[in-house]
Structures are given as C-alpha cells and as structure tokens.
C-alpha cells in the first residue's frame, strides 16, 4: 500500500514556500500520494486565539523576518520578505488547487508555483488572470474544455 499524505497548508505561507521543494522531493522518494488541502490560517488563528502576523508586536514581526531570512539562506531558496502583493487573498488560488485536485490532477507542481509566485516572483494570486497564467505555465488547462475550469 502506497503511503498517503494529507498536506494542509496556506497557499500564502512563506514557510510553505521554503519547504515546498523538499516536501515534493520527500513525497516523490517515498512514492506517497499527496492530497493538497488549502487552509485559511487567518480563520484558524481567529478560532484558536492565534495572532495574525500583522497584529503581532514589532519584536515578533522582526523575529519572523529574521527567521525567514535565515531559513532562506540555509536552504538556498530565494524569498522576498515583503512581497508587493502580501497579505493576499488566497481564495482564487485555493479554488484552483481544490478544483484540480477533485479532477485527479497532481497539484503539487501547481502548489509550488503558486507559492513561488508570491514569495519569489511577487505576483498577485488574488487576480484570476494571474492564477490562470500560473496554471497554464504548469501545463494545466484553464478553460471549460480542460480538466478543470477557473
């Protein structure tokens, strides 16, 4: 029996971006099937007493930036610490990932591209045109005639 992984993540998480390549490699080496499940961390924080990063103290915000920079350097993965389009509405990208997953499409490359669009390329994943461009660049159809529609 193949291992199965439920991969819960925010499609706007800088930590998900930094771990994405390694996660994809791990899943590939293990032969695991991966179910990508986008989650709204803002809603999770609100329900569990967590604090959105924008409402954290300046000291905590600074430490977050420091740790992101450290991990970026350690992993050799470029990251823009303050991208133009962040915070960003994740709904269009999340809907795309969910729709593609429901059609049986391997969405790990798409998920990686969405994360990179924010944290490396500074693109706006709240914009449907951008999301369709990302899908197309990953080889996914983004019209009603394709495997999923967005």
Which positions does each model-derived feature cover?
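GST-like fold's C-terminal all-alpha helical module
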Residues: 107-116, 120-150
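Structural alpha/beta surface segment adjacent to cysteine/selenocysteine redox centers
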Residues: 11, 18-118
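Extreme N-terminal starter segment of soluble prokaryotic enzymes
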Residues: 1-6
């Amino acid at each position: 029996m193949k291992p199965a992984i439920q991969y819960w993540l925010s499609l706007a998480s800088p930590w998900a971006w930094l771990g994405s390549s390694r996660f994809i490699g791990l899943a590939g080496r293990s032969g695991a099937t991966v179910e990508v499940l986008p989650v709204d961390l803002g809603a999770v924080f609100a329900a569990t007493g967590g604090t959105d990063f924008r409402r954290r103290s300046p000291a905590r915000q600074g430490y977050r930036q420091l740790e992101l920079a450290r991990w970026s350097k350690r992993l050799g993965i470029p990251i823009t610490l303050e991208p133009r389009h962040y915070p960003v509405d994740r709904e269009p990208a999340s809907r795309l990932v969910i729709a593609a997953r429901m059609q049986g499409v391997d969405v790990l490359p798409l998920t990686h591209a969405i994360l990179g669009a924010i944290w490396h390329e500074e693109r706006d994943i709240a914009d449907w045109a951008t999301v369709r461009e990302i899908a197309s660049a990953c080889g996914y159809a983004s019209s009603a005639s394709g495997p999923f529609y967005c």
